[in-house]
Amino acid sequence: MIRICPTVEEERALRAAGYRAIAGLDEAGRGCLAGPVVAAAVILPDAVIDTPDVLDGVADSKMLSPAQRADLFERITSLAVAWAVGATPAHIIDSHGILPATRLAMQVALLRLPRPADALLIDAVTLDNWPLPQRALIKGDARCLSIAAASIIAKVTRDRLMDALDACWPQYGFASHKGYGTVQHQQALRRYGPTPHHRRTFRPLCDWLATDAADEGLADGTGRSIL
């Protein structure tokens, strides 16, 4: 698969317009059956915008190996002017929907930045009523260096959270699939039922919960019926 190298064209255009704290934002975990959706905000320094080769290798996190992401995480966080993450748990995803939950995680990340942003570059979505200039870029994590950097921070952070959940719920294999709907994960769900970290409005889990209500019931993660 060909890796597309993100550029700093968007950052340079905003800088030419007078903005100096340009935050890239992206998320990880929108399509998972379990765990939070995690967003990251990253403000890169002028030195990186002027000479992006210092972050050579940064790309859409989905195109990188875990080892590459871990290495780039350290490089990005050491060079960034500011960075922060936000996470929205499964029960909020279920009650509000994945897109509002994603926006919430992004807003939390922005509020946690030690230096406030003055403009935003976001992968695919906009933050309604957020009082800053912003651009939503389709496939922004492949096109824009700041967004690609945020995608790596979000992915590594979320993977570490899922590793921690694996220590508490080892029967689900969270450390290997990170909450995505793999065959292994779906088999564990059918055997053990959902944990408090599973998204009960996501298919196929919501379908199983509905059909099992009229059947023998689905376990609650410990073998007890929840229906």
Curated annotation (Swiss-Prot):
Residues 20-214 form the RNase H type-2 domain. It comes from the Bacteria. Keywords: Cytoplasm, Endonuclease, Hydrolase, Manganese, Metal-binding, Nuclease. Manganese or magnesium. Binds 1 divalent metal ion per monomer in the absence of substrate. May bind a second metal ion after substrate binding. Its cofactor is Mn(2+); Mg(2+). It is an enzyme of class 3 (hydrolase). NCBIfam families: PRK00015.1-3. Endonuclease that specifically degrades the RNA of RNA-DNA hybrids. GO terms for cellular component: cytoplasm; ribonuclease H2 complex. Its EC number is 3.1.26.4. Pfam families: RNase_HII (PF01351). Disulfide bonds: none annotated. GO terms for biological process: DNA replication, removal of RNA primer; mismatch repair. It catalyses: Endonucleolytic cleavage to 5'-phosphomonoester. GO terms for molecular function: manganese ion binding; RNA binding; RNA-DNA hybrid ribonuclease activity. The gene is rnhB. Belongs to the RNase HII family. PROSITE patterns: RNASE_H_2. The keyword Ribonucleoprotein does not apply. A divalent metal cation binds at D26, E27, D123. This is Ribonuclease HII. It is found in: Cytoplasm.
